[in-house]
C-alpha cells in the first residue's frame, strides 16, 4: 500500500518539501562564527576559520596542535621544527636547537685526557639544600618539569602581550567587562501583587503544609509542584521579614 502512494507522489507535479539543512556540503555542522558583532566586522571571508582567528589574535582551539599545520613555501623556517616548551612532544631533547655554549671539562691530571664534560643543563638539575646538592626530584616524570620557570614566565608574558596588542581582543575584553557589570547590576525577579495574594491564601488555608497546597485543585489550578511552591514561599517570607 505504501508503494502505491509513493508512485502517486512521483507522478504528481507538486514540488517536494525539502527541509532546510543545517550542514555543509562535506556533512559537517554549520557553525555561526559571526555571532559576535565585533568579530563579524573584522572577519575576512577569503580566509579560513583558523586564519581569521590567528589574524584577530584569538585561539580557534584550546588544545595543542596535533598536526595538519599549513606549510608556507615563502616561510624561511619551513622544514625546520622549532622547540616549543609547552607542546609536550615525546622527546624534548630531540627538538632542541643546537647552539654554541660554554661548558666545563674535567681532565685527568696525569694524562690530560678528558674524563667528563659538565654541561650547564646538568648544573641546573641540582638543588642546594642545607649546604648539600641534591638532584631535582621528578618521580612522575612530568615533561613540564624540564621546562624552566623563566621559560614558562616568558611564554606567558609573550602570549599575554600578543593578545592585548590586538585591537579586536581589547574590544572583546571591554564588551565582556560591560556585560559582567550589567549582570551584577541586574535586579532579581520580583513577585507580583497577585502572586503574593495567591501565596497568602495558600498559607491562610494550609499553613506550612506544602503537600496540601500542591493537591488543592482550587487554589492551585496550574498544578505548581512542591519545589516551586516552596521557592515562592521562601521568597515571599523573606520579603515580609518572617523567614
Curated annotation (Swiss-Prot):
Pfam families: Nop16. Residues 1-22, 60-82 are annotated as: Disordered. One of its GO terms (biological process) is ribosomal large subunit biogenesis. It is found in: Nucleus, Nucleolus. GO terms for cellular component: nucleolus; ribonucleoprotein complex. Residues 71-82 have a biased composition (Basic and acidic residues). Keywords: Nucleus, Ribonucleoprotein, Ribosome biogenesis, rRNA processing. It comes from the Eukaryota. Involved in the biogenesis of the 60S ribosomal subunit. Component of the pre-66S ribosomal particle. Belongs to the NOP16 family. This is Nucleolar protein 16. It comes from Ajellomyces capsulatus (strain NAm1 / WU24).
Amino acid at each position: 500500500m505504501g508503494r502505491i502512494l509513493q508512485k502517486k507522489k512521483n507522478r504528481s507535479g507538486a514540488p517536494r518539501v525539502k527541509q532546510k539543512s543545517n550542514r555543509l556540503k562535506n556533512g559537517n555542522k554549520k557553525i555561526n562564527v559571526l555571532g559576535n558583532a565585533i568579530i563579524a566586522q573584522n572577519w575576512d571571508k577569503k580566509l579560513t576559520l583558523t586564519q581569521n582567528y590567528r589574524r584577530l589574535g584569538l585561539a580557534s582551539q584550546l588544545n595543542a596542535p596535533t598536526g595538519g599545520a599549513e606549510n608556507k613555501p615563502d616561510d624561511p623556517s619551513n622544514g625546520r621544527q622549532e622547540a616549543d616548551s609547552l607542546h609536550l612532544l615525546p622527546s624534548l631533547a630531540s627538538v632542541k636547537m643546537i647552539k654554541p655554549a660554554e661548558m666545563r671539562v674535567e681532565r685527568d691530571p696525569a694524562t690530560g685526557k678528558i674524563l667528563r664534560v659538565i654541561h650547564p643543563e646538568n648544573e641546573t638539575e641540582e638543588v642546594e639544600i642545607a649546604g648539600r646538592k641534591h638532584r631535582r626530584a621528578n618521580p612522575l616524570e612530568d615533561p613540564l618539569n624540564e621546562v624552566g620557570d623563566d621559560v614558562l614566565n616568558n611564554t606567558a608574558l609573550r602570549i599575554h602581550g600578543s593578545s592585548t596588542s590586538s585591537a579586536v581582543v581589547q574590544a572583546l575584553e571591554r564588551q565582556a567587562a560591560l556585560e559582567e557589570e550589567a549582570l551584577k547590576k541586574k535586579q532579581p525577579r520580583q513577585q507580583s501583587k497577585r502572586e503574593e495574594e495567591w501565596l497568602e491564601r495558600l498559607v491562610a488555608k494550609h499553613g506550612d503544609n506544602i503537600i496540601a497546597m500542591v493537591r488543592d485543585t482550587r487554589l492551585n489550578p496550574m498544578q505548581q509542584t512542591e519545589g516551586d511552591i516552596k521557592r515562592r514561599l521562601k521568597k515571599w517570607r523573606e520579603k515580609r521579614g518572617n523567614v
